[in-house]
Amino acid sequence: MVIDEGCILLIRRGAAIEHGKWAIPGGKVNYGETLRAAAAREVLEETGLEVEVGAVLWVGETFGEGDPPAHHIGLVDFVGRVVGGELGAADDADDARFVELAEARNFDLPSSMQRLLDDLQGSEVPT
């Protein structure tokens, strides 16, 4: 979760999974890549921003439709701080913007993002 001046970075997903939903930037880990390196790369690819990746903020999972589910994704969200770049949607993001944490609930979010916000409610979000 990239935090800048009290706002969080959201992207609108352009890829097939959760298409059109708003979420924090993220994606798959490449073979041989650390989780933190993957997080920094995904933010750069999807938003054009360079980030310093900090502590683990949240761990969760999400399942696709069907039985068995169409997909099962493990989620590890880190605190991120912008250190460079210029904001702009790229790669599989159709839009990218900073929004106030409380305002994020007004966006069309996947269930995993709603759970993340529920878990953070009332907590001091690190910057």
Where are these regions (language model features)?
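Active-site-adjacent beta-strand/loop module that shapes the phosphate/pyrophosphate-binding cleft
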Residues: E61-E86, L120
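Generic C-terminal helix-cap and adjacent flexible tail
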Residues: Q121-T127
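NUDIX/MutT-family hydrolases
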Residues: V79, G88-L120
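The catalytic Nudix box helix
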Residues: I24-L57, F78
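N-terminal strand-loop-strand
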Residues: M1-A23, V51, A55
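Short aromatic/basic micro-patch
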Residues: A23, E50, H72, F98
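Conserved hydrophobic "DFG−1" position in protein kinase catalytic cores
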Residues: V2, L10, G80-V82, F98
